[in-house]
């Protein structure tokens, strides 16, 4: 058997050092994402301040459909994103096998890349819904985005109805009556949303990569003050980084193998992909929370609405608040 050379030993030590450094950065960033969980768990108790920009977005708009049409539509995606980031943090912490830790030592690459894609896309949706400075457009996007959700829901109805049709005896059940009532209410909501669309400016609704790119482009134009990165607004800016991330992670989500072309050295490249994905997802989520809070707070007066987000986001909250006057 050939003995390892000095160069082999040096390369092994260097790789180990790189791995440890990357894992430390990944863990630190993932924990930042998990620090948003208290906000996600409690913000709905007092969603917005009276007199805030978001409160005025909601006031008198689509009240037959929901009392919080704009704020409520924007809230769910970022809560979904934070849940994914919390799972990422737990997954990364659980792999630590250094020292006395008895973690798996497994990168769980597919799981981490899938979760971070989910988080980034959901957080980007909140940014996209709220970033337009025109109240009429924010209202329009909330209505049209909700309508697009209902369009997707129709496929669920079709499969559910087919199941009941396949087993006619079930049509005497409480479950079938509840399903019919749900469809009736669904049809009513569709009509309400049609009226809402007639009352607001036209706007295109997209999802996935478009939303991620749109949110990242907005951040290039309005750099978050809590993030010292010099990436924003460059010729190759955050929009480009986010698009690259989304393409690669989407391939993993759909079971495609082409990302393996960019892992010639195996573990190190894999670890770098994970840390980049965590960075982008946490950045999107922090910015979504800050943008929501910039519009949810009444900055002209003191209120008893609790501050649930990390203090580090405050500079971005204050800077972006100026873009959304309540009146």
What do the predicted segments below correspond to?
Residues 109-165:
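Internal, hydrophobic cores of structured domains that mediate oligomerization or house catalytic pockets
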Residues 59-132:
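Long, hydrophobic/aromatic-enriched structural stretches that serve as scaffold segments
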Residues 1-76, 149-297, 303-327:
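Secondary-shell segments that build the walls of catalytic and ion/ligand-binding clefts
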Residues 97-101, 130-142, 296-307:
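Short, glycine/acidic-rich hinge or "gate" loops at secondary-structure transitions
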